[in-house]
Amino acid sequence: MLQVLGGHKRLCNGVTRRDLLTVGGLSLCGVGAPTLIPSLVGAEPTVGKADDVALPGFGRAKNVILLYLFGGPSQLETLDMKPQAPVEIRGKLQPIDSTLPGLHLCEHLPNMARVMDRVTVVRSLTHPWNFHGMQYATTGSPEGSVPLEETLGHPQHQPFLGSVVNYFDQQRQGSKPHGAIPDNLMLPFLLSSRRSAARYTAPSAMYLGSRFDPIWTEFRGEATHSAVRRSHGPAAEFRDPYLGVQRDCRFLIAAEADLPNDFSLDRLNRRRSLLDQLETLRRNLDQQAGRSVLDQKRELAFSLLDSKAIRTAFDLEQEPAKLRDEYGLTLFGQSTLQARRLVEAGCRFVTVVWDEFGQLNAGWDTHVDHYNRLTGELLPGLDLAFSTLIRDLEARGMLDDALVLVMNEMGRTPRFEGEGRGHWGRAYSNFFAGAGLKRGNIIGRTDAIGATVADRPLTAKDVLATIYHLIGINPNSTLDDRLNRPVPLCHDGKVIPEMLA
């Protein structure tokens, strides 16, 4: 059976995406298909006043690459080091100078240190919650909570940033033609689907409609390094792709990943012909609302599979081996390179998640084995991928038009808690580069131990407002939810003028 997406993510009514998007089953061509979908298309947005976009840089970004570091990187071992603090605060890693005056990076980020003059660093992000909050960080949800992050279909869920961009673009320009690169892709695999514990809620379009959900890829490749990992129990050994992957690794739209090896384009076209006949019958029998959504879902399934543009964009072997090595022959490095290929091919918004793999408290969630994980995996992987992405975009003349976002949901505790640092939302950092942004820029300051914000407190909603501004969406706009209530894109978030060029 041919499928558009490989994950089993459920909609709020309990129907899985796999149920809705199966090509060749009743969910796309059956007579009763529309009854599965109570409401998939959001209402028209309400756009804010013209003077809301008077700041510079509005609409400057043509494409966006979001690198999301799930788990909460330590601000004290990355962008906000405190060498004058007591050793129990500052830790044992040493600072080095960067090309951005006044900014010291960790000694394990030497390549990043050489490109920070192209970057804006925000070191004064703050919120009161100490839990993983990707929903809070990347949507308009005004508050965070554990149920919000872990409950599918939570009533307070808001549409993911990339889905909002996709929605506004289609309101203005209509859908892309058949075979074009999709505009809201996420790598490398469905959020938290490769860890041993329960999954977090993956980003979605919520009330905007499932056709604006991010399209996840599937990773195909073998890890080259084994890791011994321990969460809060016995240690376990497994092969970790974030430490290294074989060169023949690749990313697939999950539809292609699910196909049998002998599935040909001829078979695809024959199936399309059959579906067209069934579709004609279905249209004659049922003219309910929502029909266009199902048509678009089916068309997307085929376009993802028979499009030369999509196949080419996902062919990492077209890249020079030297450049692939510079990005890092790791899952994060190759995901970041794949993101560059996708925006170069015309994708509007690509997200790469450095996700947990194998065990709970993996990724950047360094409760245990803090230093070994930072120095052996996390910092070197980020160092290569981000620095090479900036240099690569610049060399291709793309950095002025592409917006690069490096975001996370929180920082780490100033004091160690056993073998690592705990969750800390009161002070953390994000950094950004590219279209419409000021270069070589530091915003905000924390106290002497990196525990609280001492100057220019900002929130994730302020960051979102600034991103929307640069993308060309008025951050004061509202969207109607399923009950036709206006919901602000960023709630009380305001554009950060110091970030703008």
Where are these regions (language model features)?
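Ligand-binding pockets and gating/stacking loops
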Residues: 1-501
